Amino acid sequence: MKKIILAISFLFVFMVCAFAQASDFQRAVGHFKGHAATATATRTTHKAALAKDATAQGTLTMSQPAQVEIAIDGGKDALLMEGSTFTMTVKGKKHVTTSQQNPQFATFQKVFEAILAGGTQDIAALKEVSVKKDGKQLVLTITPEAADKKQQRRMMFSSFVLTIDAATSQLRSLRMNEKAGNYTDYTFTNFQFK
């Protein structure tokens, strides 16, 4: 009997925590519903083997239903998510994949679709996502899980960290962590809803 009561108590606490996280997320991204957004983007590329980080300027454009573009140096370098299609442009050369071909982007896609929908899509059920409230900011960490060792070796990123201003719904940063301590960090300023 004690085990049953303990199990029910644990389940209740888990449900309350999941509901609280979903509620925090919905409040934090509520301004996106029905709006597009733009911002100035600053990219910082950190390579553990190099002494100095490289920085560059660009723009962030987000529009519904599922388009997110970060263009750096006039589009010479860019990240574009259009639904399930992901395009990375590096020095003018395009690399295209989809969330079906490259599963590490599937949860990333679902999270951004939920953000652009103003929080109406539930992310609480996504096991690869953790949501943490840090003062006035909401921090979403997406840690893709590989199905096997081969897929894990092919993964470009070990995690994605999104920081959202909980009061204004403004996306503050996106950090894409790579292997061996390398990362690319995008910080966003002059955020505007349209």
Which functions belong to the PLM regions below?
Residues 124-127, 131-194:
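Gly/Pro-enriched, hydrophobic low-complexity segments
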Residues 1-4:
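Positively charged n-region of N-terminal signal peptides that target proteins for export
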Residues 16-56, 63, 67:
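N-terminal leader/targeting segments and the immediate start of mature chains
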